[in-house]
């Protein structure tokens, strides 16, 4: 279970925070909120109910907090609780965004705001185990009552609260920042806050450093969850007394980090008055989070899916009737054919397995090829607080390590699951030892391919040719070698010893972290453009400038020797306007063999025949006729489709038609077709509800041909995007 957290952010919204200082183009409050929003949205993005947040406003126009309401003590005036401690969601972020604005007063005590935050944490956490934290962000220009700081420090330590104080333009020798011509009043306040942070064993620093460190992605620390708990067996203990059984646990060692998945929403259409919209059972089963997110916006609603099953029935309206899922037999696709397998036959394909990790063999480590790894790595450790298992597994690990052997195992993570072949390699460190585990392929998964050699050509007669136009010359090999040396990333220190210039811990995935940054930014700033990509994420997207300069000459020589030439860009509309090369004899073999032009496209082989028909004509009427034939074939495929069995063929046909008509510069023919097809799909005129087909068209981006795809089109990009919505359009 994840550790419970309670964090209170104290945000200074005084009148002085509305000014721009330090050469910045944004106010001190907006600059400060860059850090605060980053921390809050990071917490919200985890989705954990145990990660709670509270927000206190310092130097607000009014006073709204329990300590003020109790006795109306002046020390707690101009302090407002913007957000009580609890899980923060998107509606809370929107509410907080409206509250955080510069006030009209500079009255408010920062020390008292810390007391208020302590009170909030004590009341919420009680005596339960929480990770408690207070973050004060201020410009240090408010009045402060430093009496009783010692008791505040004692309470912070007693409650186990971590105190972090960040200041706008605070002096920080460790970071190397000092504000010139500082107001003596602010200097005194900085000194008071620094003493408070130091005495409470907290952190004190300047806001500039915190904002700068925001661009560096934070490494997510996750709690290990065992993916397998069971026996590691050598031999069968149930049959042989010499069999060995060790209780072990399996954890991820490496895991692929993926960006957040997108959720599907549609523009909502308000129902008639007095009519409510019913929630789909599928949506409700998937949880309430999607529905809450959709309802939070007035313009979006969650996408609801409904699946129906139909079979051909000549007596039913439309030639098909709907059936229940329970009335259907299970089948598998074999090409375009649905193959039925009965339950009795399907049992044969399933192995009756028992959860265990079993040794089935050993190999020398030098004989193992790294390309056999098929998965991320896991670690196998002995069962915790089981000294006998720890000692037994340690003996096995040391034996494999000393003999330089790897073990081959058969892993079944749960009863009834298919087995996996795994490699087990020993790992021994100073304070840790385990077996590293990766998945191996079965014999049926391996394919052996033979490729021709790269340094010679063997003719049909068996002659070996070492000088050929397809083989690199000695000069080319030498120049390429020089270029590779100049591109070497190795770096050396002043003593000539190599060091790692691209440390693994300093390399981040731009895809994962940029999308995460964009989501968190858009949650707070729905209309502002995204901030620029941080340099730490761009570092691996561009060549180092020093390396480019170093390899410039060798690259120029390589281009010259290898005779690299720029390929001209592909011309649009080339198919109709291209002049064919005239043979010297005057006889065109293609014309002689082509025969008569194709007039009719058959439904059995529509795509090749459609292309052939277009290739054999330059008459616009013939092209239009071919488009009409192809349109009728696609509509018949959809109309006669049993479920979605013909949808892939129809999508392929639509894509081919779009590609060919772009090449022939006839966007109008395709746009007229796709408009009519959308209308028929949404009006259920192609054999019932075919909205899933329209969803596939949208997914494949087969909408209108716009001006971006073809300059002569009269459809703008905005019109093309609007057309791909699920609503009827007049584009």
From Swiss-Prot:
UniProt keyword list: ATP-binding, Chromosome, DNA damage, DNA recombination, DNA repair, DNA-binding, Helicase, Hydrolase, Nucleotide-binding, Nucleus, Telomere
GO MF annotation: an example: ATP hydrolysis activity
Catalytic activity: ATP + H2O = ADP + phosphate + H(+)
Domain Ku: 238-486
DNA repair listed as a keyword: yes
Xref: SMART domains: Ku78
Transmembrane segments: none
GO biological process, one term: double-strand break repair via nonhomologous end joining
Pfam family, one: Ku_N
Record text on subunit structure and interactions: Heterodimer of Ku70 and Ku80.
Function according to Swiss-Prot or TrEMBL: Single-stranded DNA-dependent ATP-dependent helicase. Involved in non-homologous end joining (NHEJ) DNA double strand break repair. DNA-binding is sequence-independent but has a high affinity to nicks in double-stranded DNA and to the ends of duplex DNA. Binds to naturally occurring chromosomal ends, and therefore provides chromosomal end protection. Required also for telomere recombination to repair telomeric ends in the absence of telomerase. KU70, of the KU70/KU80 heterodimer, binds to the stem loop of TLC1, the RNA component of telomerase. Involved in telomere maintenance.
Entry similarity comment: Belongs to the ku80 family.
Protein name per the record: ATP-dependent DNA helicase II subunit 2
Species the sequence originates in: Coccidioides immitis (strain RS)
Phylogenetic placement of the source organism: Eukaryota, Fungi, Dikarya, Ascomycota, Pezizomycotina
Name of the gene: KU80
């Amino acid at each position: 279970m994840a550790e419970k957290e309670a964090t209170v952010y104290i945000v200074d919204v005084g009148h002085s925070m509305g000014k721009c200082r330090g050469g910045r183009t944004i106010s001190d409050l907006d600059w400060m909120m860059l850090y605060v929003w980053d921390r809050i949205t990071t917490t919200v993005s985890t989705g954990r109910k145990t990660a709670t947040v509270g927000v206190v406003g310092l130097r607000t126009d009014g006073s709204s907090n329990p300590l003020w309401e109790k006795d109306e003590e002046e020390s707690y005036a101009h302090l407002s609780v913007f957000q009580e401690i609890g899980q923060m969601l998107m509606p809370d972020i929107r509410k907080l965004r409206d509250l955080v604005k510069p006030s009209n007063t500079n009255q408010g005590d920062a020390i008292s705001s810390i007391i208020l935050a302590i009170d909030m944490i004590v009341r919420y956490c009680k005596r339960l185990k929480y990770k408690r934290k207070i973050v004060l962000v201020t410009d240090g220009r408010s009045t402060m009552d430093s009496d009783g700081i010692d008791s505040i420090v004692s309470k912070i330590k007693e409650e186990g609260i971590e105190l972090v104080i960040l200041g706008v333009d605070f002096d920080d020798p460790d970071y190397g920042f000092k504000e010139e011509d500082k107001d003596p009043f602010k200097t005194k306040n900085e000194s008071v806050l620094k003493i408070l942070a130091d005495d409470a064993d907290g952190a004190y620093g300047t806001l500039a450093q915190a904002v700068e460190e925001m661009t560096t992605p934070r490494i997510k620390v996750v709690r290990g969850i065992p993916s397998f708990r069971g026996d590691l067996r050598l031999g069968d203990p149930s049959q042989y007394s010499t069999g060995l059984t060790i209780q072990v646990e399996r954890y991820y060692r490496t895991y692929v980090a993926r960006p957040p998945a997108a959720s599907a929403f549609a523009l909502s259409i308000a129902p008639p008055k007095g009519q409510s919209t019913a929630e789909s059972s599928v949506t409700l089963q998937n949880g309430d989070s999607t529905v809450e997110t959709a309802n939070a916006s007035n313009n979006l609603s969650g996408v609801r899916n409904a699946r129906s099953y139909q079979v051909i029935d000549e007596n039913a309206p439309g030639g098909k009737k709907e059936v229940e899922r329970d009335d259907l037999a299970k089948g598998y696709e074999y090409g375009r054919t649905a193959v039925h397998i009965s339950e009795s036959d399907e049992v044969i394909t399933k192995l009756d397995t028992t959860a265990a990790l079993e040794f089935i063999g050993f190999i020398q480590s030098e004989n193992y090829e790294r390309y056999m790894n098929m998965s991320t790595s896991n670690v196998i450790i002995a069962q915790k607080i089981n000294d006998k298992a720890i000692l037994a597994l340690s003996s096995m690990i040391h034996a494999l390590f000393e003999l330089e052997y790897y073990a081959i195992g058969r892993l079944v993570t749960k009863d009834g699951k298919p087995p996996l072949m795994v490699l087990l390699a020993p790992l021994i460190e100073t304070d840790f030892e385990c077996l590293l585990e990766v998945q191996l392929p079965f014999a049926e998964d391996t394919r052996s391919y033979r490729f021709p050699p790269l340094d010679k050509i063997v003719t049909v007669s068996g002659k070996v040719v070492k000088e050929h136009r397809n083989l690199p010359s000695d000069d080319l090999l030498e120049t390429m070698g020089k270029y590779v040396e100049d591109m070497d990333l190795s770096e050396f220190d002043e003593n000539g010893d190599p060091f790692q210039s691209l440390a693994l811990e300093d390399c981040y995935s731009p895809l994962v972290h940029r999308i995460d940054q964009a989501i968190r930014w858009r949650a707070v700033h729905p209309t502002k453009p995204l901030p620029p990509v941080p340099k730490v994420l761009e570092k691996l997207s561009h060549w180092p400038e020093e390396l480019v300069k170093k390899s410039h000459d060798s690259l120029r020589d390589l281009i010259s020797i290898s005779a690299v030439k720029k390929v001209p860009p592909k011309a649009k509309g080339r198919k109709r306007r291209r002049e064919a090369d005239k043979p010297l004899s005057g006889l065109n073999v293609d014309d002689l063999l082509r025969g008569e032009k194709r007039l009719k496209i058959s439904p059995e082989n529509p795509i090749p025949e459609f292309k052939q028909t277009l290739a054999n004509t330059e008459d616009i009427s013939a092209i239009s006729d071919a488009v009409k034939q192809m349109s009728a074939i696609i509509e018949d495929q959809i109309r006669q489709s049993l479920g979605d069995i013909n949808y892939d063929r129809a999508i392929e046909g639509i894509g081919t038609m779009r590609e060919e008509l772009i090449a022939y510069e006839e966007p109008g023919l395709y746009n007229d077709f796709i408009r009519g097809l959308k209308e028929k799909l949404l009006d259920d005129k192609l054999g019932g509800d075919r909205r899933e087909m329209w969803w596939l068209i949208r997914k494949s981006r087969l909408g209108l041909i716009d001006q971006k795809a073809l300059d002569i089109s009269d459809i703008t990009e905005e019109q093309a995007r609007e057309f791909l919505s699920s609503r009827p359009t007049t584009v």
